[in-house]
């Protein structure tokens, strides 16, 4: 009987704590550094991890650099080898907070929140302040955000020979469906 009580207590404790966290391993990040009239510079990573702590609004995500896909494999190779040095810097991370987050006030209509945190790429960390748009979809929570970063902030060097074809100001779009 004592063993049954202890097992039940452990199960309930785990269940309660699990309710405070929502996550996914199938989040999406799309970035674009295109310049009009030149080749599209756009990549997508659809295997991004994201964790949201529902009690605090704390959010974090991790993207493996080598999981970004371009329309041309040569772009992917240059991105990983020359610009991001993905063997030395294999991931990008974001850690932050959704200000005023309250799961109870989010419904099927999109609700805007302020998202603040730090983005780390290539060992360099920069603050990010943007809007996040949240809504419930069945038993999941959709989190969408968009922001801009500058390649210089993360020591990403674009060779002079092609710097007129790649924008230093990169638009980053994120989409997570956490459960």
PLM features: what roles do these ranges have?
Residues 1-22:
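Bacterial Sec-dependent N-terminal signal peptides
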Residues 19-179:
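Low-complexity, acidic/polar, glycine-enriched regions of mature
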């Amino acid at each position: 009987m004592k063993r049954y009580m202890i097992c039940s207590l452990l199960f309930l404790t785990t269940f309660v704590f699990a309710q405070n966290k929502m996550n996914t391993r199938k989040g999406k990040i799309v970035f674009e550094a295109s310049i009009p009239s030149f080749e599209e510079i756009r990549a997508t990573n659809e295997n991004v991890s994201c964790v949201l702590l529902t009690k605090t609004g704390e959010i974090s995500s991790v993207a493996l650099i080598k999981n970004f896909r371009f329309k041309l494999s040569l772009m992917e190779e240059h991105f990983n080898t020359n610009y991001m040095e993905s063997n030395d810097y294999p991931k990008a991370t974001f850690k932050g907070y959704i200000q005023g987050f309250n799961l109870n006030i989010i419904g099927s209509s999109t609700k805007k929140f302020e998202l603040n945190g730090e983005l780390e790429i290539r060992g360099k960390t920069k603050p990010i302040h943007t809007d996040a748009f949240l809504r419930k979809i069945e038993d999941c929570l959709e989190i969408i955000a968009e922001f801009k970063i500058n390649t210089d902030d993360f020591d990403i060097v674009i060779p002079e020979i092609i710097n007129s074809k790649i924008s230093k100001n990169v638009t980053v779009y994120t989409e997570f469906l956490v459960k």
